[in-house]
Structure formats: C-alpha cells, structure tokens
Amino acid sequence: MSVPAALTTVDDRVAGVLHDGGGEPSGHSPRPFLHPVSTPGGRSVSDYRPEDHPWHWGLGIAVSTIDVVGQAHPANLWGGPTYRDGAGYVKLPNNGSQEVRVEEGRDDGRVQQLDWRTADGTVFLAETRSWHAESVRAGGVEWLATTVRSRWANTSGGPLAFGSPTTSGRPDAGYGGFFLRLAPSFAGACIVAASTGPAPSDVPAPPGGAGTRLSEADAMGSTRSWLGLRSPDASVLMVPAADNPGGSSPWFVRSTGTPMLCAAPFFHRKLHLGVGGVLHWTWSLLTADGPVQDDAFAAAADAV
C-alpha cells in the first residue's frame, strides 16, 4: 500500500487525494480511488465508506459484473454482494481487486500500472491509468477538472464480458464504469444533462436552452454526452469521451437517498473484449463551487 498522493494542477490547486486502495477489505473489492474530490474552493464533493454502501469510495473505475473464463461466478470489482437473476443480491466468493503494481508522479499528473484480479488472485486484465488535473474557466465559472485515461488489455487467455446488475436482470441498476459517490450534500440535487430533445413536460426548461433539467427517473439509463448535478454548495459535471467504446454513455445517477453519478457503459448490454483485445477510455470530472447555471455546465463540457 502506497502513501496517498495529492493530485494537483500546474497552479497548485488540489483536485483530490489519490489512494491505491491497498488497505481496503477484500469484500469491498480494493481498487484505486480519489477522495476527497475537491472544488476550487476546497469543498469536498465525494463520500468515503458511507454507511449504506461502505464499498463506495470517492471517484474511480469500478465494474460489478465481469465474465471471466474458468471462474464459477462473475468477477465483482465494484464491492459488496453480486446481483443474480432470481436470487437478488447474494454474497459470493467473487470480490476481486485492481492491484496497483507501479505508480509514478509526473509533471502532468500520476500514472498507475494495474492488474485486475479475480478473488482467487488470477490476473485477467492489465490496465494503464493516468490521472490529470487542470483548472478550467468556462461559462464564467472556475472549475477543477480531473481527467482519467485508461487502457485495458485482456490478458486472461479467454474472452471477457463487462456487465451490470441490469444485464443480469435487475431493471435500472446498470451501474459500473467511471463512478463518483457523491457527498451527502448532493441529496436532492438538481440533475442537468446535455440536450437530446424536448425536456419532459413536468421538468422546468433551462433558461439558456443549453442543457436539460431531468428528473432522476428520466436521467437513469439515458444516453447523453454529459451529465451534472447542482447542489446549493457545489456542482459536478461528468464528461465521457465521444470515442469511448460503445459510443455515448448511458448514465446511472441518483440524487435521492444515495447520491451518486456514474458513466455506465455496461448499463443496458454487456461489452465484450476478445482474447488479447484492448480498450481505450477517457473520462473527465469537473467540480465548481456553488450552484452553477445550466449554460455553464454546457460550456464546461465543451472545454474538456
């Protein structure tokens, strides 16, 4: 387990603190995470080990359901129990890990070399992950942007399939991907998303027309180029790259009860990766102080 390291911009703002996850319980699927994730003013927008889901830690990459040849159960690199159709959530001996083999600091951020392992220690995927932070001014707002670039290489000797509880039979539970467990202050936050058409009739239209305010039900599982949440204290915006595998990302988002935001590429269907195959991903998370207006969300999404 390495010492946590601050992820900073060139102008010395701290976007968050990077942990390798090495000291976390095995049943929580140890993996790297950024926490606290900070706004330019130093307010934390992330949560760590909340009572309802103690395997939720800040910002990171987490996948709940991975089919690996030779394993009795799908590998769980999300943490906690696994959803099985007809049985619900079941505690299985399948909690794997993302083990950081090498981590180094660079002028533009930090780079990690990781092994994805099943519960029995078998390595099935090699990942190179970079973390980069920068200050962004967009829409008249100061933002802190954290960008993660990730290369996944299948080293298992067989095909892999990445899924979610929804691909396993549970509706509206397609979580897994680039995940942020939000701070409790985001309970009841307003959801703002890229416009893809008319807003639902029961949701007020945004003043600038640059985005759409969505109910949680309408946002859940929808496919949009970006999605954000606005609370009285802070705002967050998540932007997946347009050329990520599978195209525009579906979203898993909650602002009631358990606030969280996840670009969830495996929400509706499994993503398959053949023997020796490689996937490239890029995601950005932007934070700002206070309740950002809709047009500023859109401007920030265009800036990364």
Model-predicted segments: where are they?
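Beta-strand-rich recognition/accessory modules
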Residues: 236-304
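Beta-strand-rich N-terminal accessory domains
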Residues: 1-66, 159, 163, 286-292, ...
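Extracellular/lumen-exposed scaffold segments
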Residues: 26-78, 194-197, 204, 210-221, ...
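Acidic (Asp/Glu-rich), glycine- and aromatic
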Residues: 18-37, 139-192
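Active-site/ligand-binding surface loops and adjacent short beta/alpha elements
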Residues: 158-246
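Intrinsic-disorder/low-complexity, polar/charged segments enriched in Ser/Thr/Lys/Arg/Asp/Glu/Gln
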Residues: 107-111, 143-147, 276-282
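Extended, loop-rich substrate-binding clefts of extracytoplasmic carbohydrate-active enzymes
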Residues: 60-142
